[in-house]
Amino acid sequence: MKQLQVLLVAGTHGNEINGIWLFDEWKKSSFLINTHGIKTFKVIGNPEAKKAGKRYIHHDLNRSFKEESFIKINPLNCERTRASELVNLYGEAGENPCQIALDFHTTTASMGSCIVVYGRRDADLALASLIQNQLGLPVYLHESDQKQTGFLVESWPCGLVVEIGPIGQGLLNSRIISQTKLILETLMEQIHEVKNLNLFFPNKLIIHRHIKSIDFPRDEEGNIDGYVHSLRQSKDWQELKKNDELFCKLNGEIIRFEEDEPYIPVFINEAAYVEKNIAMSFTKRELWNFKKEWKQALIDLIHQK
Amino acid sequence: MKQLQVLLVAGTHGNEINGIWLFDEWKKSSFLINTHGIKTFKVIGNPEAKKAGKRYIHHDLNRSFKEESFIKINPLNCERTRASELVNLYGEAGENPCQIALDFHTTTASMGSCIVVYGRRDADLALASLIQNQLGLPVYLHESDQKQTGFLVESWPCGLVVEIGPIGQGLLNSRIISQTKLILETLMEQIHEVKNLNLFFPNKLIIHRHIKSIDFPRDEEGNIDGYVHSLRQSKDWQELKKNDELFCKLNGEIIRFEEDEPYIPVFINEAAYVEKNIAMSFTKRELWNFKKEWKQALIDLIHQK
């Protein structure tokens, strides 16, 4: 059996710096974080953007991991180049092949901590289940979004995003750092347990399945002319029912939620999503039965069968 | 007597947009905001930066109002040019001379609402006293800071900054908009009362006098290697006593407040101040007797004697 290697990424967005702090702390005092002897590689996702104090230089790095991007290095696109580089260094067929990628993010939305999975890969769902079972975190299943693709973790056989908020861009915050550390350690501990076949998977997984994102209200010229209603602001994960308030418009009109079935909003008023025309995303909360295939996929991956 | 004219500025920093929203709302429905018949000019301070979604293009506009800047237009400095333009348009000797400037800002720090005065000008202190008497807001006296000069309101005979937080950069927030509106209306109402000589000034003014700003801890290479301690985060306006925790360093060390006299911190972890090497500012809370000269200066100004 080859040695299991795990890629840890922080600063995929250059202005989300709390995970980077944790890596620096860890470098200084290796005892601070317990990885249970599993080999890890800690990298800053987008060091150029970090230096510039920006989310990205040319394109969002976490939308740059598309198959076609890896064909050639493009000197005019810092992020496509970095995506290729990371895959060449730590991808499954790279210099230091990693089987699992964990990508640490922050949000300006009042989401607390959550795990994001991209699509329904068995090993991802198994690992997310283990974390939900340990920490009770919501799991956000991001799928069916044609406008947003090419996420970093998708380039690894198994990968999760950890998303923590609220925190302003470019700021360090003691609470966010502690929460990041807790989730990182829990992830490593759970991977270790699977490695030792000391398994305890839950029967159910609560999934917040992405349905769609909605834009802010806009005027005829395309300018935003409505803000998130006070009853919706900071109410991530709280169920929306028909006629609930969504936005206040410039003309005083209130825009309400008009769907018949309840949705759960997330990423409400996330600063980085204004440019993506996203005021919030809607999810459906679903209770899924844990599947044996998920468990087997994660075991096979970690044991590199 | 010439007509009193008041300059209202929002978006002096292009990513502080809640005041701009209020102006747009007001344009649409003029009854929404009561200015008591006083002539106002509403301007976006830095429209270029607003378009770019940034605090500024070349330099902070609210540090660009220096006498020497007004000598000539500099096409390579968008903000110096804009500062001259605003003074030419609305300055005391401008096309539409305004006697009072009110400048609406937001902060990512948990400051709530406050009034900022730059230096100890009589009319500013009188107007700030009226607002404190109505709304109980803290008044932050910014002075003795050689590194920060050239503030917009200093170019008008009387001028206050309204600062409201916490809110992420570039975001609209219903609470911030409501608070901005309340303070704007209260300011106009109080100016109106002075105009009508219907005066009620308090006997005392509580001032938070700026003492100094402190930087984040840094390593030998100048990189930030400490974050605001969890006991200090979001504790703006709360008194610091000797040995209180200020920062956590990368090496685990806690940096404490070591002065003998108590200070009151403000702008704790303000995102825009990281580039200014400011982790927070220290003030002293002082109770000042209201002075007759302040009142007279404001009356004279508003009545244009």
From Swiss-Prot, chains A, B:
Its EC number is 3.5.1.15. Binds 1 zinc ion per subunit. InterPro entries: AspA/AstE_fam (IPR050178), Aspartoacylase (IPR016708), AstE_AspA_cat (IPR055438), Aste_AspA_hybrid_dom (IPR007036). The keyword Hydrolase applies. Its cofactor is Zn(2+). GO terms for cellular component: cytosol. GO terms for molecular function: aspartoacylase activity; hydrolase activity, acting on ester bonds; zinc ion binding. The keyword tRNA processing does not apply. Keywords: Hydrolase, Metal-binding, Zinc. It is an enzyme of class 3 (hydrolase). It catalyses: an N-acyl-L-aspartate + H2O = a carboxylate + L-aspartate. Belongs to the AspA/AstE family. Aspartoacylase subfamily. This is Probable aspartoacylase. It comes from Prochlorococcus marinus (strain NATL2A).
